[in-house]
Amino acid sequence: LLGLVASAVLRCDDCIKYHLETSYKEGITKEEMMEAMGIATLVGGTIVIPHLRRAYEFWEALEESGQ
């Protein structure tokens, strides 16, 4: 999750997807992921919000595919 926060703050979409997929496979809950992204927004500011939206959409896709 720390990698996810750092990737969001640095606004690296490919990195965010990597950490989301890894977190999902490790059994991280949606609530834990959203808390981490909230911390990223706190650290990185509002510029992180578009990446938060894409991260949420990617997480939803992971849940739908059941990977």
Which stretches of residues belong to each language-model region?
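Hydrophobic alpha-helical segments
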Residues: 1-67
